[in-house]
A protein has these predicted regions:
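Short amphipathic alpha-helix that is part of the acyltransferase structural core
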Residues: 1-34, 127, 137
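Short, flexible, glycine-rich and Lys/Arg-enriched loop motifs at helix boundaries
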Residues: 5, 98-101
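Alpha-helix N-cap/helix-start capping motif
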Residues: 10, 66, 109-110
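A short helix-loop-beta-strand connector motif used in the catalytic cores of GNAT acetyltransferases and
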Residues: 38-49, 102-103
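Conserved beta-strand in the GNAT
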Residues: 49, 55-64, 71-76
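Conserved acetyl-CoA-binding loop-helix of GNAT-fold acetyltransferases
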Residues: 77, 83-96
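Conserved active-site alpha-helix within GNAT-family acetyltransferase domains
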Residues: 100-106, 110-136
Length: 137
């Protein structure tokens, strides 16, 4: 396997959807909402992808200021390519793009919660989420 990693290489919303469908992430993303998925792909300012030839097999999709914080919003690896270090490499390359003081932040999927501590992340119990239908009171 000769994996090629690319930084900010354009991908289509359809390629992104197909990858999510072949990973575990589609369960938690609106893959049936093409407009939303297009917005997710087109408005990310840091995307690292993994390719096996012409086949997209992994993605780390982030929003960042490159100096203080980088939110890694999606990390997906095709199920046939999992447990080969691709996800870890996507994160390493993402971190490589950031300034020396920039933190990498993510919300772990329930099944992946223990994985992130194993590769060096520290758990932060102070995270809060305001859902789309929730309102500031």
């Amino acid at each position: 396997m000769n994996m090629i990693y690319k930084v900010n290489h354009p991908i289509s919303a359809q390629q992104f959807i197909e990858l999510l469908d072949k990973s575990t992430l589609a369960q938690r993303r609106p893959t049936d909402d093409k407009k939303c998925m297009e917005g997710m792909v087109n408005n990310s300012n840091l995307m690292v992808t993994a390719w096996d030839g012409d086949t997209l097999v992994g993605v780390a999709r982030s929003m960042t200021d490159f100096h203080y914080a980088c939110y890694l919003s999606d990390l997906a690896v095709h199920r046939d390519y999992q447990k080969r270090g691709i996800g870890k490499e996507l994160q390493r390359i993402t971190q490589e793009q950031l300034g020396e003081k920039c933190r990498l932040i993510l919300v772990a999927a329930p099944a992946a919660h223990s994985y992130y501590g194993h590769i060096g992340y520290s758990n932060n119990p102070r995270c809060w989420v305001l859902g789309r239908d929730d309102r500031i009171s």
